């Protein structure tokens, strides 16, 4: 491997950040691969995602110049490159995007000249190798390139609209049909005439000669619903440059998989799979997917059968599938992680910190996949054998996915190898039907939302509930029902009430919404059954009107159910202490995956790979209760996000935080949290874990109770202990020893019983041999044996077979009115003519039973009654008919 060392991938990354730092930019870290501000987006797929709210005006930032290296993923939804990865020069699931941004500060002049300076002066790219494009009407950018930078006119290409549609151009960027938009200018690298392809905008533009390096977007307009463009008061700059394709150019190689970073990963993949040909495309797949999987897991995504977890599982299994194609039958993929850490860990310390967790997650998925592949292949083969037209039915592909965890793309791959295909339309129809069936109807209020137009007219609800649980002067600003907005509601109606201020906490962060009462001075009374957050900023009181009526503009008083809120606060604070204890016991790979903070209990889901032992459970419980007894003051403080992180505060995966955050500290626990809490940890009183289980691969769940609920749980357990002691004639202090003595005695009696059964069977065998009937030199035994269970029955059958060289045997064990049947065919004279499974069916049908098995052995059952005797008496005749 001969990779130029002057511009390694690592150096390119650091050069970029250093360059823009010197230009006055604040260097910000990569946002997580799971967007915190856009629920419609599966993954962060570009550098602008974390700044979307800034461009939309929903978020204000103190800094006006920013640069970063953003981790991106394109493997699901609209931006899905998965099927192309490994087989093309520049497709990846995971990639890094270099970007610099201006929020109303510098504009085209600086963006263009700095880009040229970095490319030609710092990275020493020959200017004659570069070509730029501009939007057809963007004369300003054209002039800057020609007059200020000095690019010849024959190296500047104006790009118009596609198919004549206004602003539908590769060189005009828009977030949506309306909103921020503007022209962009792109910088291309010319690989030379020996590479096929023409310049951008030409018929041959899809060739590989001209490769886009950098896209500079100038957001200067606000597109209206009628298509007109209104200049923005503060234009912005958004640029993006793919690190991998830039590295390929600077390292003088043609494909991204030839750069230093990928070559290191490919060589490791070749070592793990024992493949000598490092050009094998499967190695590219494994190398690429190792990055995507590791960074997804680092950012809190775990393999599952839905959503982002399903995409991760697909990527993992695609890599494992390619390993399987290379002949690998043992786990290998997890061993890519140390090499990945070696080449990317310095740039991403969180990858280094989570390496062990990533490896364990991948190993668990590899072991799971081996089982899935074994079972799934058997089912696939059964389905394929029945297919006459070469099309695997969509319903069967869905059954493989839904029941056996067999990814549909894997089914499609295997089908393709056999000259078949999957009915994907049928698969999607089955998937859609399942979603409809599984979608819970939900209680009133959860599906109701404000329109964007109405929301724009309202100010966010002011939450008073941190300091007070009762408040007056709450003005009704909107009323919603299942039918949408309404101006008024009357007695008996269920309606969501939005007020300008409220003491009611809206469900968020796992904490349930408050309940209570809304009232007016004229006797109006509304029962608040829940409080939900609408559009992330409005508190919706889910109510039933029990007296009077309410209309928009009314002024109400609100009272939160105080006792319930306090119980919720106990459990929320206990959740923080539990989270801290879990990380202390198991390590920093523990991360919250979900929670429920209710008045009667708390539920906490977290990343961990194995069941918790009794000793570990006791330790965790003790650690939490130690913090409770320490009676720490719960301190709550507002501070900047970076200051909070520097102070050791835990930010929860999937939560969206602003520049200023609320930090909750109690003892050694420090978390960012918007929930309600107690004053001191001692208020919790007692913390008690009541259950622990797994909820999905790599995710465990603990349920616990606090305060009076914990005391009641302990008292109930104590009551059960005394009840058990009474049943066994012991006292509570000696229950364990007494039960141990009873179980030892039981084992002794069971051994004695087995000996007696053995003697009974020996005597029974002697009796059965004496009843054997000779039919054409084949011994036929058909007998009823009262009191023998299935195990004893099979033992008797095996002993008879040892003593009868040619025999047909039917034994019926009768216990409690039920019949257990076993049949056997033994020896050359009977085998081939008499089949045990056919004989069993003949007998079983006569006693309202059924069964099955092989030609030499079968078992089944039925009901006791007069017909059993006649069925057994007829066995010899049946055998004779089949032997003749």
From Swiss-Prot:
Cofactor binding, note field: Binds 1 zinc ion per subunit.
Identify the cofactor(s): Zn(2+)
Specify which residues bind Zn(2+) according to the UniProt entry for this protein.
572, 576, 673, 677
> Keywords on this record?
Aminoacyl-tRNA synthetase, ATP-binding, Cytoplasm, Ligase, Metal-binding, Nucleotide-binding, Protein biosynthesis, RNA-binding, tRNA-binding, Zinc
Catalysed reaction, written as an equation: tRNA(Ala) + L-alanine + ATP = L-alanyl-tRNA(Ala) + AMP + diphosphate
Which Pfam family is an annotated match for this chain, by its short name? Answer: tRNA-synt_2c
Q: Per the UniProt entry, what is one GO biological process?
A: alanyl-tRNA aminoacylation
* Highest taxon above the source species: Bacteria
- Name any one GO molecular function: tRNA binding
Task: Give the UniProt subcellular location, in the record's own words.
Answer: Cytoplasm
Gene Ontology CC entries for this record = cytosol
PROSITE patterns from the UniProt entry: AA_TRNA_LIGASE_II_ALA
Q: What is its EC number?
A: 6.1.1.7
Q: Which family does it belong to?
A: Belongs to the class-II aminoacyl-tRNA synthetase family.
Q: What is known of its domains?
A: Consists of three domains; the N-terminal catalytic domain, the editing domain and the C-terminal C-Ala domain. The editing domain removes incorrectly charged amino acids, while the C-Ala domain, along with tRNA(Ala), serves as a bridge to cooperatively bring together the editing and aminoacylation centers thus stimulating deacylation of misacylated tRNAs.
Q: What is the annotated role of this protein in its UniProt record?
A: Catalyzes the attachment of alanine to tRNA(Ala) in a two-step reaction: alanine is first activated by ATP to form Ala-AMP and then transferred to the acceptor end of tRNA(Ala). Also edits incorrectly charged Ser-tRNA(Ala) and Gly-tRNA(Ala) via its editing domain.
This chain belongs to the protein called Alanine--tRNA ligase
């Amino acid at each position: 491997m001969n990779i130029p060392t002057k511009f390694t991938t690592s150096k390119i990354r650091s050069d970029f950040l250093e360059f823009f730092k010197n230009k006055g930019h604040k260097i910000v870290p990569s946002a997580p691969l799971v967007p915190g501000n856009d629920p419609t987006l599966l993954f962060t797929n570009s550098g602008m995602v974390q700044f979307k709210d800034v461009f939309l005006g929903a978020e204000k930032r103190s800094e006006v110049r920013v640069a970063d290296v953003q981790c991106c993923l394109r493997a699901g939804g609209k931006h899905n490159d998965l099927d192309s990865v490994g087989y093309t020069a520049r497709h990846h699931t995971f990639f890094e995007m270099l970007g610099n941004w201006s929020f109303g500060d510098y504009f085209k002049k600086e963006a263009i000249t700095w880009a040229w300076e970095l490319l030609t002066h710092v990275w020493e790219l020959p200017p004659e190798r570069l070509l730029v494009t501009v939007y057809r009407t963007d004369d300003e950018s054209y002039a800057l390139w020609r007059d200020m930078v000095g690019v010849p006119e024959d190296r500047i290409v104006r790009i118009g609209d596609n198919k004549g549609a206004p602003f539908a151009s590769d060189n005009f960027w828009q977030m949506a049909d309306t909103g921020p938009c503007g022209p962009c200018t792109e910088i291309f690298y010319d690989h030379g005439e020996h590479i096929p392809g023409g310049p951008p905008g030409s018929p041959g533009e899809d060739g590989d000669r001209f490769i886009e390096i950098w896209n500079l977007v100038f957001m200067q307009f606000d597109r209206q619903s009628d298509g007109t463009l209104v200049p923005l008061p503060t234009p912005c700059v958004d640029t993006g440059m793919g690190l991998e394709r830039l590295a390929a150019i600077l390292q003088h190689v043609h494909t991204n998989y030839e750069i230093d970073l990928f070559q290191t990963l490919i060589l490791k993949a070749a070592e793990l799979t024992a493949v000598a040909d490092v050009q094998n495309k499967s190695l590219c797949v494994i190398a690429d997917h190792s990055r995507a999987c590791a960074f997804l897991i680092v950012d809190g995504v775990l393999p599952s059968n839905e959503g982002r977890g399903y995409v991760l599982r697909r990527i993992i299994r695609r890599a494992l599938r390619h390993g399987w194609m290379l002949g690998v039958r043992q786990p290998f993929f997890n061993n890519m992680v140390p090499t990945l850490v070696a080449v990317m860990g310095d740039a991403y310390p969180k990858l280094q910190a989570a390496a062990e967790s990533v490896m364990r997650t991948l190993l668990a998925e590899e072991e799971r996949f081996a089982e899935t592949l074994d079972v799934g292949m058997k089912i696939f083969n059964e389905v394929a054998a029945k297919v006459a037209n070469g099309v695997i039915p969509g319903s069967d592909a869905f059954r493989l996915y839904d029941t056996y965890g067999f990814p549909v793309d894997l089914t499609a791959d295997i089908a393709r190898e056999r000259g078949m295909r999957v009915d994907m339309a049928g698969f999607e129809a089955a998937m859609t039907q399942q979603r409809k069936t599984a979608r819970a109807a939900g209680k009133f209020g959860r599906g109701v939302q404000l329109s964007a137009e109405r929301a724009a007219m309202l100010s966010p609800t002011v939450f008073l509930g941190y300091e007070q649980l009762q408040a007056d002067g709450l003005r009704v600003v909107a009323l919603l029902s299942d039918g949408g907005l309404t101006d008024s509601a009357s007695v008996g109606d269920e309606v969501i009430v939005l007020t300008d201020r409220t003491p009611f906490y809206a469900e968020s962060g796992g904490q349930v919404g408050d309940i209570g009462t809304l009232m007016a001075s004229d006797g109006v009374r509304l029962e608040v059954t829940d409080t939900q957050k609408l559009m992330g900023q409005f508190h919706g009181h889910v109510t039933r009107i029990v007296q009077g009526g309410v209309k928009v503009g009314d002024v109400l008083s609100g009272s939160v159910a105080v006792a319930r809120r306090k119980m919720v606060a106990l459990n929320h604070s206990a959740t923080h202490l539990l989270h801290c204890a879990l990380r202390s016991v198991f390590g920093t790979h523990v991360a919250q995956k979900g929670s429920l903070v209710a008045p009667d209990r708390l539920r906490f889901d977290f990343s961990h790979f194995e069941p918790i032992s009794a000793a570990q459970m006791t330790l965790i419980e003790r650690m939490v209760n130690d913090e409770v007894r320490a009676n720490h003051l719960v301190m709550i403080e507002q501070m900047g996000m970076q200051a909070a992180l520097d102070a050791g505060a835990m930010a929860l995966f999937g939560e969206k935080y602003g520049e200023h955050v609320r930090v909750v500290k109690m003892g050694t626990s420090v978390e960012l949290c918007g929930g309600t809490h107690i004053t001191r940890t001692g208020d919790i009183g007692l913390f008690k874990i009541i259950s622990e289980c797994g909820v999905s691969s790599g995710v465990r769940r603990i349920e616990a109770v606090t305060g009076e609920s914990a005391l009641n749980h302990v008292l109930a357990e104590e009551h059960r202990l005394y009840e058990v002691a009474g049943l066994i004639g012991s006292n509570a202090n000696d229950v364990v020893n007494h039960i141990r003595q009873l179980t030892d005695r039981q084992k002794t009696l069971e051994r004695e019983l087995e000996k007696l059964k053995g003697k009974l069977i020996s005597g029974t065998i002697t009796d059965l041999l004496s009843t054997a009937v000779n039919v054409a030199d084949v011994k036929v035994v058909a007998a009823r044996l009262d009191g023998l269970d299935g195990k004893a029955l099979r033992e008797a059958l095996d002993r008879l077979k040892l003593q009868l060289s040619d025999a047909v045997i039917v034994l019926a064990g009768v216990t409690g009115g039920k019949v257990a049947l076993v049949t056997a065919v033994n020896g050359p004279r009977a085998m081939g003519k008499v089949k045990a499974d056919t004989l069993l069916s003949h007998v079983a049908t006569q006693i309202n039973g059924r069964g099955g098995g092989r030609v030499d052995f079968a078992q089944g059952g039925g009901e006791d009654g007069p017909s059993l005797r006649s069925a057994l008496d007829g066995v010899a005749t049946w055998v004779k008919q089949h032997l003749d």
